[in-house]
Amino acid sequence: MSIYKTIGVTPIINAKGPATRLSGGLMRPEVAEAMVQASQHCVDMAELQAAASQQIAGATGAEAGYVASGASACLLLAAAACMAGLDPGRMARLPDTRGMKNEIIMIRSQRNFYDHAIRAAGATIIEVGLPDRYSGAGVRDAEGWEIEDAISERTAAIFYVADAAAQPPLPVVTAIAKRHKLPVIVDAAAQLPPQSNLKRFIAEGADLVAFSGGKLLGGPQASGILCGRKD
């Protein structure tokens, strides 16, 4: 009997793909075995995260990496890092961001349920662009000049949701950010496969990239990796 049936839950046929609300993707057997082995020992979590950071950096081409409880948690941590930096006092005050740069620019057509993670960290999302392309009223989306025009002394970062149809292209956004010395956070939760995307977003200039561990990476559902700059 299925373990789910013992608690009255009915297994389903998932024809959509690794969606979080449908319990993500199926975990690889070797991952399950590794979790069983790991569960038999205690380790220093700081040492484990440092070792994981090296593994993630090697796979993504980033300077460092971090394991969190999902891509959404990674986005919250990324937003928090962009606002508080390495200041422990500011870290302790979050989500109270008074006195900090706390605005994060986001393309209006990329808004979604998961950007709540950005707001949960204490950030205010500043929307730019017109989603004409999705309403059928035109072909216009956000343009580079609109992102640049929204930058102010309160801007902490630019948030970009990776998608095949995303406009403007990520390199355009990262070029704008670099001119203004701002970090770019990329939500790439569902952008695997292809495997090349593990390194693509860092190569295109992103500073922090979040991937889901519970989709096609084949890890546990409540997992995610954040990769990017050490600082």
Tell where the protein language model's regions lie, with residue ranges:
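Conserved PLP-enzyme active-site core in the AAT-like
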Residues: 1-22, 26, 53-67, 72-231
